[in-house]
From Swiss-Prot:
One of its GO terms (cellular component) is plasma membrane. Interacts (via transmembrane domain) with ATP6V0D1. Interacts with LAMTOR1, RRAGA and RRAGC. This is Type 1 phosphatidylinositol 4,5-bisphosphate 4-phosphatase. Its EC number is 3.1.3.78. The lineage of its organism: Eukaryota, Metazoa, Chordata, Craniata, Vertebrata. The modification Phosphoserine is found at S169. Catalyzes the hydrolysis of phosphatidylinositol-4,5-bisphosphate (PtdIns-4,5-P2) to phosphatidylinositol-4-phosphate (PtdIns-4-P). Does not hydrolyze phosphatidylinositol 3,4,5-trisphosphate, phosphatidylinositol 3,4-bisphosphate, inositol 3,5-bisphosphate, inositol 3,4-bisphosphate, phosphatidylinositol 5-monophosphate, phosphatidylinositol 4-monophosphate and phosphatidylinositol 3-monophosphate. Regulates lysosomal positioning by recruiting JIP4 to lysosomal membranes, thus inducing retrograde transport of lysosomes along microtubules. GO terms for biological process: cholesterol metabolic process; lysosome localization; phosphatidylinositol dephosphorylation; positive regulation of TORC1 signaling; proton-transporting V-type ATPase complex assembly; response to sterol depletion. It comes from Macaca fascicularis. It is a multi-pass membrane protein.
Length: 284
Protein backbone atom coordinates (compact mmCIF):
# COMPACT_ATOMS: atom_id res chain seq x y z
CA UNK A 1 0.00 0.00 0.00
CA UNK A 2 2.85 2.34 0.75
CA UNK A 3 4.28 1.71 -2.66
CA UNK A 4 0.94 2.48 -4.28
CA UNK A 5 0.67 5.73 -2.36
CA UNK A 6 4.10 6.84 -3.45
CA UNK A 7 3.14 6.38 -7.14
CA UNK A 8 -0.01 8.55 -6.85
CA UNK A 9 0.16 12.21 -7.94
CA UNK A 10 0.71 14.93 -5.42
CA UNK A 11 -2.26 17.00 -6.62
CA UNK A 12 -5.53 15.32 -7.31
CA UNK A 13 -7.64 16.05 -10.35
CA UNK A 14 -11.12 17.41 -9.51
CA UNK A 15 -14.09 15.31 -10.37
CA UNK A 16 -17.71 16.21 -10.80
CA UNK A 17 -18.82 17.78 -7.49
CA UNK A 18 -22.46 16.79 -7.92
CA UNK A 19 -21.65 13.19 -7.08
CA UNK A 20 -20.66 13.91 -3.47
CA UNK A 21 -17.10 12.60 -3.75
CA UNK A 22 -14.27 13.76 -1.55
CA UNK A 23 -12.23 15.01 -4.46
CA UNK A 24 -9.16 12.89 -3.62
CA UNK A 25 -7.59 10.41 -5.89
CA UNK A 26 -6.76 7.12 -4.45
CA UNK A 27 -4.19 4.71 -5.49
CA UNK A 28 -4.41 3.68 -9.09
CA UNK A 29 -5.44 7.18 -10.25
CA UNK A 30 -9.16 6.84 -9.49
CA UNK A 31 -11.53 8.79 -7.22
CA UNK A 32 -14.17 7.44 -4.93
CA UNK A 33 -17.70 7.79 -6.13
CA UNK A 34 -20.91 7.94 -4.14
CA UNK A 35 -21.19 4.21 -4.06
CA UNK A 36 -17.72 3.71 -2.78
CA UNK A 37 -16.49 2.67 -6.23
CA UNK A 38 -13.57 4.19 -7.99
CA UNK A 39 -14.07 6.37 -11.09
CA UNK A 40 -11.33 7.50 -13.43
CA UNK A 41 -10.15 11.00 -12.63
CA UNK A 42 -8.89 11.92 -16.13
CA UNK A 43 -8.90 10.35 -19.58
CA UNK A 44 -5.78 8.56 -20.60
CA UNK A 45 -3.04 10.48 -22.35
CA UNK A 46 -3.98 11.33 -25.88
CA UNK A 47 -7.59 10.32 -25.51
CA UNK A 48 -8.92 13.85 -26.10
CA UNK A 49 -7.05 14.30 -29.35
CA UNK A 50 -8.45 13.34 -32.72
CA UNK A 51 -6.71 10.50 -34.36
CA UNK A 52 -5.04 11.41 -37.65
CA UNK A 53 -6.94 10.26 -40.72
CA UNK A 54 -5.77 6.95 -41.98
CA UNK A 55 -7.19 7.31 -45.50
CA UNK A 56 -4.33 9.48 -46.80
CA UNK A 57 -0.91 7.91 -46.99
CA UNK A 58 2.05 10.04 -46.02
CA UNK A 59 3.63 12.07 -48.80
CA UNK A 60 6.73 10.44 -50.22
CA UNK A 61 9.92 12.29 -49.69
CA UNK A 62 11.24 13.47 -53.07
CA UNK A 63 13.43 16.19 -54.44
CA UNK A 64 12.34 19.72 -53.49
CA UNK A 65 11.00 22.10 -56.16
CA UNK A 66 13.99 24.39 -55.77
CA UNK A 67 17.32 22.90 -54.73
CA UNK A 68 19.53 24.82 -52.30
CA UNK A 69 21.66 27.32 -54.15
CA UNK A 70 19.44 27.20 -57.26
CA UNK A 71 17.63 30.30 -58.55
CA UNK A 72 13.83 30.14 -58.73
CA UNK A 73 12.22 30.05 -62.18
CA UNK A 74 12.05 33.49 -63.81
CA UNK A 75 8.81 35.42 -63.62
CA UNK A 76 6.95 35.56 -66.88
CA UNK A 77 4.47 38.41 -67.37
CA UNK A 78 2.33 36.14 -69.54
CA UNK A 79 1.49 34.00 -66.52
CA UNK A 80 0.39 36.97 -64.45
CA UNK A 81 -3.38 37.16 -63.90
CA UNK A 82 -3.27 40.88 -64.66
CA UNK A 83 -1.67 40.36 -68.05
CA UNK A 84 -3.21 38.96 -71.17
CA UNK A 85 -4.68 40.29 -74.35
CA UNK A 86 -6.03 43.47 -72.75
CA UNK A 87 -5.71 46.56 -74.98
CA UNK A 88 -2.84 48.79 -73.90
CA UNK A 89 -1.74 52.28 -74.95
CA UNK A 90 1.34 54.32 -74.12
CA UNK A 91 1.06 57.36 -71.89
CA UNK A 92 1.92 60.54 -73.78
CA UNK A 93 3.70 61.98 -70.72
CA UNK A 94 5.67 59.22 -68.98
CA UNK A 95 5.52 56.53 -71.72
CA UNK A 96 4.02 53.99 -69.31
CA UNK A 97 1.53 51.37 -70.46
CA UNK A 98 -2.13 52.06 -69.65
CA UNK A 99 -4.76 49.33 -69.66
CA UNK A 100 -7.83 50.64 -71.50
CA UNK A 101 -9.98 47.55 -71.11
CA UNK A 102 -13.52 48.65 -70.39
CA UNK A 103 -12.64 52.31 -71.10
CA UNK A 104 -12.89 52.33 -74.88
CA UNK A 105 -16.06 54.42 -74.70
CA UNK A 106 -14.11 57.28 -73.10
CA UNK A 107 -12.17 59.94 -74.97
CA UNK A 108 -9.28 60.11 -72.49
CA UNK A 109 -7.83 57.81 -69.84
CA UNK A 110 -5.78 58.61 -66.77
CA UNK A 111 -2.31 57.19 -66.28
CA UNK A 112 -1.76 55.43 -62.99
CA UNK A 113 1.91 56.46 -62.84
CA UNK A 114 1.92 60.18 -63.58
CA UNK A 115 -1.84 60.81 -63.10
CA UNK A 116 -2.03 62.68 -66.42
CA UNK A 117 -4.68 62.22 -69.10
CA UNK A 118 -3.95 60.62 -72.46
CA UNK A 119 -6.46 60.73 -75.35
CA UNK A 120 -7.54 57.43 -76.88
CA UNK A 121 -10.07 58.89 -79.33
CA UNK A 122 -10.22 61.91 -81.56
CA UNK A 123 -11.62 65.07 -80.05
CA UNK A 124 -15.36 65.67 -80.51
CA UNK A 125 -16.38 67.59 -83.63
CA UNK A 126 -15.34 71.21 -83.38
CA UNK A 127 -12.93 70.49 -80.52
CA UNK A 128 -9.20 69.83 -80.27
CA UNK A 129 -6.72 68.69 -77.65
CA UNK A 130 -4.00 70.99 -76.32
CA UNK A 131 -1.40 69.92 -73.74
CA UNK A 132 -0.10 72.59 -71.41
CA UNK A 133 3.65 72.68 -70.58
CA UNK A 134 2.64 71.44 -67.12
CA UNK A 135 1.35 68.26 -68.89
CA UNK A 136 -2.31 69.11 -68.28
CA UNK A 137 -4.46 67.93 -71.20
CA UNK A 138 -6.96 70.60 -72.26
CA UNK A 139 -9.83 70.48 -74.74
CA UNK A 140 -11.00 73.62 -76.49
CA UNK A 141 -12.72 74.79 -79.64
CA UNK A 142 -10.94 74.52 -82.95
CA UNK A 143 -11.25 78.28 -83.45
CA UNK A 144 -9.78 79.15 -80.04
CA UNK A 145 -6.69 81.35 -80.13
CA UNK A 146 -5.90 81.65 -76.41
CA UNK A 147 -6.70 79.28 -73.56
CA UNK A 148 -5.78 79.27 -69.87
CA UNK A 149 -4.63 76.28 -67.86
CA UNK A 150 -7.11 75.57 -65.03
CA UNK A 151 -4.54 74.22 -62.58
CA UNK A 152 -4.11 76.62 -59.64
CA UNK A 153 -0.32 76.35 -59.60
CA UNK A 154 -0.02 76.95 -63.35
CA UNK A 155 -2.66 79.40 -64.69
CA UNK A 156 -0.62 79.71 -67.86
CA UNK A 157 -2.03 81.47 -70.92
CA UNK A 158 -1.40 79.44 -74.07
CA UNK A 159 -1.43 81.26 -77.41
CA UNK A 160 -2.57 78.96 -80.20
CA UNK A 161 -2.14 81.48 -83.01
CA UNK A 162 -4.68 82.56 -85.62
CA UNK A 163 -6.95 79.83 -86.85
CA UNK A 164 -9.01 80.24 -89.99
CA UNK A 165 -12.40 78.58 -89.52
CA UNK A 166 -13.80 76.35 -92.15
CA UNK A 167 -12.92 72.97 -93.55
CA UNK A 168 -9.33 72.65 -94.58
CA UNK A 169 -8.85 71.38 -98.09
CA UNK A 170 -6.36 68.55 -98.17
CA UNK A 171 -3.16 69.23 -100.02
CA UNK A 172 -3.18 67.58 -103.44
CA UNK A 173 -0.87 64.67 -103.74
CA UNK A 174 1.87 65.12 -106.31
CA UNK A 175 1.13 63.31 -109.54
CA UNK A 176 3.92 62.05 -111.68
CA UNK A 177 6.30 59.26 -112.51
CA UNK A 178 9.36 58.20 -110.59
CA UNK A 179 12.32 57.81 -112.89
CA UNK A 180 15.95 56.73 -112.52
CA UNK A 181 18.38 59.40 -113.68
CA UNK A 182 20.54 58.31 -116.60
CA UNK A 183 23.54 60.21 -115.18
CA UNK A 184 23.69 59.59 -111.40
CA UNK A 185 21.24 56.64 -111.19
CA UNK A 186 19.24 58.38 -108.43
CA UNK A 187 15.43 58.34 -108.37
CA UNK A 188 13.43 61.55 -108.75
CA UNK A 189 9.84 62.55 -109.52
CA UNK A 190 8.94 63.77 -113.00
CA UNK A 191 5.65 65.67 -113.12
CA UNK A 192 5.64 67.38 -116.55
CA UNK A 193 3.42 65.37 -118.86
CA UNK A 194 4.28 67.09 -122.14
CA UNK A 195 5.68 66.09 -125.51
CA UNK A 196 9.02 67.55 -124.46
CA UNK A 197 10.17 64.74 -122.21
CA UNK A 198 13.31 66.43 -120.91
CA UNK A 199 13.88 66.40 -117.17
CA UNK A 200 16.57 67.89 -114.95
CA UNK A 201 17.69 65.66 -112.11
CA UNK A 202 17.52 67.46 -108.73
CA UNK A 203 20.54 65.50 -107.53
CA UNK A 204 23.14 66.02 -110.27
CA UNK A 205 21.40 68.95 -112.06
CA UNK A 206 21.92 67.29 -115.46
CA UNK A 207 19.31 67.01 -118.21
CA UNK A 208 18.14 63.67 -119.53
CA UNK A 209 15.24 62.38 -121.57
CA UNK A 210 12.39 60.31 -120.17
CA UNK A 211 12.38 57.48 -122.68
CA UNK A 212 14.09 57.24 -126.06
CA UNK A 213 11.26 58.39 -128.31
CA UNK A 214 11.71 62.15 -128.00
CA UNK A 215 15.53 62.31 -128.46
CA UNK A 216 15.38 59.82 -131.33
CA UNK A 217 12.79 61.90 -133.17
CA UNK A 218 14.77 65.09 -132.61
CA UNK A 219 17.98 63.43 -133.73
CA UNK A 220 16.45 62.24 -136.99
CA UNK A 221 14.92 65.65 -137.72
CA UNK A 222 18.16 67.51 -137.05
CA UNK A 223 20.20 65.05 -139.06
CA UNK A 224 17.91 65.29 -142.09
CA UNK A 225 17.86 69.08 -141.88
CA UNK A 226 21.64 69.22 -141.54
CA UNK A 227 22.05 66.83 -144.46
CA UNK A 228 19.72 68.97 -146.57
CA UNK A 229 21.65 72.12 -145.69
CA UNK A 230 24.93 70.38 -146.49
CA UNK A 231 23.64 69.38 -149.93
CA UNK A 232 22.32 72.91 -150.42
CA UNK A 233 25.67 74.42 -149.47
CA UNK A 234 27.47 72.07 -151.87
CA UNK A 235 25.14 72.88 -154.76
CA UNK A 236 25.31 76.58 -153.97
CA UNK A 237 29.08 76.48 -154.01
CA UNK A 238 29.28 74.68 -157.35
CA UNK A 239 26.56 76.83 -158.93
CA UNK A 240 27.97 80.19 -157.89
CA UNK A 241 31.66 79.43 -158.14
CA UNK A 242 32.23 81.70 -161.09
CA UNK A 243 30.04 84.51 -159.75
CA UNK A 244 31.73 84.43 -156.35
CA UNK A 245 34.89 85.89 -157.82
CA UNK A 246 32.91 88.89 -158.98
CA UNK A 247 30.50 89.28 -156.01
CA UNK A 248 32.01 88.86 -152.57
CA UNK A 249 28.64 88.46 -150.83
CA UNK A 250 28.26 84.97 -152.28
CA UNK A 251 31.00 83.73 -149.96
CA UNK A 252 28.97 85.00 -147.02
CA UNK A 253 25.96 82.98 -148.25
CA UNK A 254 28.12 79.89 -148.50
CA UNK A 255 29.40 80.38 -144.97
CA UNK A 256 25.90 80.92 -143.61
CA UNK A 257 24.48 77.74 -145.20
CA UNK A 258 27.48 75.69 -144.17
CA UNK A 259 27.21 77.02 -140.61
CA UNK A 260 23.52 76.02 -140.46
CA UNK A 261 24.37 72.55 -141.75
CA UNK A 262 27.10 72.13 -139.14
CA UNK A 263 24.78 73.32 -136.36
CA UNK A 264 22.04 70.89 -137.41
CA UNK A 265 24.44 67.98 -137.62
CA UNK A 266 25.92 68.91 -134.25
CA UNK A 267 22.45 69.08 -132.74
CA UNK A 268 21.65 65.67 -134.17
CA UNK A 269 24.79 64.33 -132.54
CA UNK A 270 23.71 65.93 -129.24
CA UNK A 271 20.33 64.20 -129.32
CA UNK A 272 21.92 60.90 -130.29
CA UNK A 273 24.28 61.03 -127.29
CA UNK A 274 21.70 62.22 -124.74
CA UNK A 275 21.30 60.10 -121.61
CA UNK A 276 17.94 58.41 -121.14
CA UNK A 277 16.14 58.14 -117.78
CA UNK A 278 13.84 55.18 -117.39
CA UNK A 279 10.54 55.35 -115.44
CA UNK A 280 10.14 53.13 -112.40
CA UNK A 281 6.50 53.24 -111.28
CA UNK A 282 3.53 55.55 -110.99
CA UNK A 283 3.67 57.73 -107.89
CA UNK A 284 -0.07 57.94 -107.57
Amino acid sequence: MAADGERSPLLSEPIDGGAGGNGLVGPGGSGAGPGGGLTPSAPPYGAGKHAPPQAFPPFPEGHPAVLPGEDPPPYSPLTSPDSGSAPMITCRVCQSLINVEGKMHQHVVKCGVCNEATPIKNAPPGKKYVRCPCNCLLICKVTSQRIACPRPYCKRIINLGPVHPGPLSPEPQPMGVRVICGHCKNTFLWTEFTDRTLARCPHCRKVSSIGRRYPRKRCICCFLLGLLLAVTATGLAFGTWKHARRYGGIYAAWAFVILLAVLCLGRALYWACMKVSHPVQNFS
